[in-house]
Each structure stands twice: as structure tokens, then as C-alpha cells.
Amino acid sequence: NQRLFVGDGSNNRILVFDIAPDRIATGMDAAIVLGQESFTAREPGLSARRMSRPGSLAYDATGQRLFVSDSGNNRVLVFDVAPQRLETFAIADDVMGQPDFETAAPRTDLRGFATGGLAYDDRTARLFIAEQVSRIEHMRITVYDVSADASLRAAEPLAVLGKPGFGAYDPIVSREQSVWPRLGSASIDSERQLLVATEG
């Protein structure tokens, strides 16, 4: 649909640009804003419409869903971004990492995570979440089934990468372990390989 989604974390919002060849121009305005009621508002919030320090984004072209790493609220928001339904200050369809849209406390069970980078595999409908906060146990990548019939709010990870198990905490550098993993929209290549940058 020739749209560009931009995470504007400092202003607690996502900007949506129409990048059709005949419309793109230097200094162009965004067409839609998510997370705020207007283009001049910037307050963080906790609801189905608001977010706090959004970071990485992942796009599902088949289902026309946008996954937003809402790092300040320890969750991932899922928006329906079909052109006929997307609008400014849209309500998220679903949430991952929290039981509802009004909860933001860090969770220590399998359904919680510390949000970081996101990558989406469109062939398998898997969402990869890089957890890269200061808590050692969250220096890992968790893998979720986000297919259309999956229960996202109650989702538990299918697997963990970068650690030998869900209860492994040591920041050891080895073939199976990593520190400060980073993911982005280009992290899955045409051969279905997941490319992970690590640091620290």
C-alpha cells in the first residue's frame, strides 16, 4: 500500500507516511499518527490507543497488522493497519506481554517479556522479540506464534534463542548464548535465516 511506518519514541507515537511515488517529497507531512490524538501531542500513556517510548516495528503484509514494541509499557501492541480502517489515534486490536491494555508492570512468567527489537517471518507467522534490557535474564530472543487464529494476549513463547532455556540467566558468550541481541525489519533473509546482531 506504499506506506512507511516510523517509530518516534521520544514523542510516544508512530508516524505513517504515504510514500506513493507521486506523493513523496522532501519535508512532506505524515498522513496519520498512532499513539497520539494529534500531530502536536506527545504525552506517554497506557491504553489501547496510547504508548510509551515505542521502538521497533514489525509489519505483517498478509494480515495487514503492525506490531509495535511499546517498551515503556512492557508490551507489544498489535494494530490493524488495513488502509480502510487505519486512522489517527487508532485503537490497538490486541496486546502481547500483558493481560489487558491497562497493565504495564514487568512480568516474570512465560507470557511476559522486556520488549526490544522485533522481526516478523511472514511464511510461518512467527514474531521474534529481542529482549535487551539490563536484566540479565532478558538478554534473549523469544519466538511467538502470531498467526490469525492465535490467542496473542495469552501467548507463551514457542522457543527461546540466545539462552539454553527459559530459566538461564548467565550472560555467557557461546554458540548458543548471546548478550544484548538486536533485531530489525531486515533480520530474516530469503533463506529463512534469522540474523542477530549482538553487543556487550
Q: Where are these predicted regions, by residue range?
A:
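Signature of short aromatic-glycine-proline-rich micro-motifs recurring in repeat-based ectodomains
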Residues: N1-Q2, L46-G63, R107-T124, P171-Q193
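Residue position within the beta-strands of beta-propeller blades
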Residues: V6, V68, I129-A130, V196-A197
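Short loop/turn segments immediately following the C-termini of beta-strands
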Residues: G9-S10, I19, S71-G72, V81, ...
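Beta-rich catalytic cores
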Residues: S10, D29, R53, G72, ...
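Short loop/turn segments that connect beta-strands within the blades of beta-propeller domains
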Residues: S10, T62, G72, R123, ...
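A short loop-to-beta-strand structural motif that recurs across blades of beta-propeller domains
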Residues: N12-V16, D29, N74-V78, I91-D94, ...
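Short loop/turn segments immediately following beta-strands, especially the blade-tip
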Residues: D18-G27, F79-F89, Y144-A154
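Surface-exposed loop and turn segments in beta-propeller and other repeat-based domains
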Residues: G27-R49, T88-L110, R153-S178
